[in-house]
Amino acid sequence: MNLVSLENFLDNTSFLVLFLTMLVYWAGAAFPSIPLLPGLGSTGVAIANLCIAALLGARWLEAGYFPISNLYESLFFLAWGVTAVHLIAEYTSRSRLVGVVTTPVAMGITAFATLSLPGEMQTSAPLVPALKSNWLMMHVSVMMLSYAALMVGSLMAIAFLIVTRGQNIELKGSSVGTGAYRLQNKLSTTLSAPIFMETANGGTTALLTPTLTAMATLSPQRLSLAETLDNISYRVIGLGFPLLTIGIIAGAVWANEAWGSYWSWDPKETWALITWLVFAAYLHARITRGWQGRKPAILAASGFVVVWVCYLGVNLLGKGLHSYGWFF
């Protein structure tokens, strides 16, 4: 089997394994009494991670350079990063719920790379002179790892918002998610049926008395789940943000060496800055401003869209120095 055939086998295998693993995690969430499913899910993600690593290694041997120079390679590197961050988050949190939201994204990335990209974008090609630099591995790999971590953290925030929908959740204790939650019931004021009373002059008057109606509260199990999701989200974003910062700085140094300017407001650079600002605002709100509960989760959830626009949306528009030029 030559390297090209091996790569085709590995990319299809990684997609199939992630698809089956996604079904296992969903089944485990629907039927938590089945003890075998969580272990199968973790094993599936580990196998997919190894398959993608082997694919990237084969690509490296075939092309002779670190395989992150085109969209196909970067998508698989991103999928590898998502599965790696998943394994770290799952191990540290001891929660099998991580895979419920991360495996669909990892599977979707591999499906897009394997099934949707044109054939010419899946083949390796010699590097252009501008990319023949050690900064390629330093800058791009760190940026892709930061995207993976920030995506996983944002997914945990989205899951937190779903679990706590319709409720006002606040975190007691430190901002790192180690305290317990308290639930503030949302009370709505309504008017009871009128009570008619006779007045002194023989007439009648209607008395309207307000009543308080409390919304349904979360169960203790859901409160514990919300705490776990918030904790994972905060810690994973705390991992991805320094990587994003390092990646942006490395890119600026590389740009100065290649084009004589640290920053040129290329669309990719602009959206990288927007991504940095969104997650900087999230961490600032959590650490300094004391935001807790749903408000910072909404900010983190919006970062999921921002990361995808920065990584894929700008690249596919065919504009700027970072374009893959597929749509235009």
From Swiss-Prot:
Q: Which GO terms describe its biological process?
A: cytochrome complex assembly
Looking at the UniProt entry, the stretches that span the membrane are 15-35, 36-56, 68-88, 97-117, 142-162, 236-256, 263-283, 297-317
Compartment list: Cellular thylakoid membrane
Record keywords: Cytochrome c-type biogenesis, Membrane, Thylakoid, Transmembrane, Transmembrane helix
**Principal location class:** membrane
Q: Which GO terms describe its cellular component?
A: plasma membrane-derived thylakoid membrane
Instruction: Give an example GO molecular function.
Output: heme binding
Q: Which Pfam families match?
A: Cytochrom_C_asm
Topological category with respect to the lipid bilayer: Multi-pass membrane protein
Q: List, alphabetically, the NCBIfam families matched.
A: cytochr_II_ccsB (TIGR03144)
How would you summarize the oligomeric state and partners of this protein? May interact with ccs1.
Tell me which family the UniProt entry assigns to this protein: Belongs to the CcmF/CycK/Ccl1/NrfE/CcsA family.
Q: What does this protein do?
A: Required during biogenesis of c-type cytochromes (cytochrome c6 and cytochrome f) at the step of heme attachment.
Q: What is this protein called?
A: Cytochrome c biogenesis protein CcsA
- Which lineage ranks, top first, belong to the organism behind this chain? Bacteria, Bacillati, Cyanobacteriota, Cyanophyceae, Oscillatoriophycideae
Gene name per UniProt: ccsA
